[in-house]
Amino acid sequence: MIPRVFILLTLVALFCACSTLAAVSHIEVDCIPAFTVYLLYGFVTLTLICSLITVVIAFIQCIDWVCVRFAYLRHHPQYRDRTIAELLRIL
């Protein structure tokens, strides 16, 4: 079973990105001073970059978890330790 942290991190990052884009899509730029617009778009860019980095980190962690699980299950059964498997959340 895939740990819930991977799914949670991905969902939080996607929620932040989508909510930021939804909030910005309703703003009329003509009514706001230039500095505020630049500040707002800077915040949107920062939020999207952080969300993208979070998704990439969660994806790399998921790949690492799959590789560790594959390497552990490839060993001969007599060398498998149940406590290590529970610690790594493999079984």
From Swiss-Prot:
UniProt keyword list: Early protein, Host endoplasmic reticulum, Host membrane, Membrane, Signal, Transmembrane, Transmembrane helix
Signal peptide: 1-22
Chief location bin: host cell
Record Pfam families: Adeno_E3B (PF03376)
Gene Ontology cellular component list: host cell endoplasmic reticulum membrane; membrane
Ranges annotated as spanning the membrane: 35-60
Cell location: Host endoplasmic reticulum membrane
Lumenal side: 23-34
Annotated membrane topology: Single-pass type I membrane protein
Top-level lineage group: Viruses
InterPro entries, sorted: Adeno_E3B (IPR005041)
General function of this protein: Down-regulates the EGF receptor.
Family: Belongs to the adenoviridae E3B family.
Designated name of the protein: Early E3B 10.4 kDa protein
